Amino acid sequence: MAETRLPRNPKPQEWLAKDHSLQYIADYKPFNFVDGEGVRCSVYVSGCLFNCPGCYNKAAQNFHYGQPYTQDLEDQIIEDLSQSYVQGLTLLGGEPFLNTEVCLKLVKRVRKEFGHEKDIWSWSGYTWEELMKESSDKLELLHYLDILVDGRFLLAKKDLTLQFRGSSNQRIIDVPQSLQTGKVVIWDKLVH
């Protein structure tokens, strides 16, 4: 029998990164082909409170999972991103928006080193609309992104044929265009 429990739904600013993040990384996968467009360097942060049934990375929900984020790891990520065939950085988890201290440090360095030559993608259980009501650190992180895949994974809407998404409620959002227009703009390369 399929599980009918739903993910947790926080009130605006109920979950603050400063109250939860231990600055742990669940995994780092350089030269990845599945976490966004092109070749990516994917950073999986530790800790998520959404607790989505059917989560593909349940171990990373634990804020203690993995290892502490270090300067050595950051330097390795930057070195890997410097390869000409790497298109960009991807933040996943866990929940990147509950790990803003680590994620902001990294995305700021990526922009300093590469400008917009490398794109930045992030997955989040938060929807765009929820992030618009969130704390300043979450909004700051959002402003560094090029693409946001938003929304909690919903087992009842699971669809493995979707491009870069696990369930049909999730959207692939063009962040700069959405911020400029004040409304959600779907990524123009969306196939399905």
How would you label these PLM feature ranges?
Residues 99-111, 158-192:
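P-loop/Walker A phosphate-binding loop and immediately adjacent motor/lid segment at beta-alpha junctions
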Residues 29, 124, 152, 176:
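Residues at the C-termini of beta-strands that transition into short coil/loop
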Residues 1-44, 57-62, 184, 189:
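N-terminal [4Fe-4S]-dependent radical SAM core
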Residues 44-47, 51-54:
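The −1 position to Zn-ligating cysteines in a subset of zinc-ribbon hairpins
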Residues 145-154:
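Non-cysteine beta-strand/loop elements that form the S-adenosyl-L-methionine
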Residues 43, 95, 148:
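Conserved, mostly hydrophobic/aromatic
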Residues 15-16, 22-26, 39, 54-122, ...:
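Conserved Radical SAM active-site core
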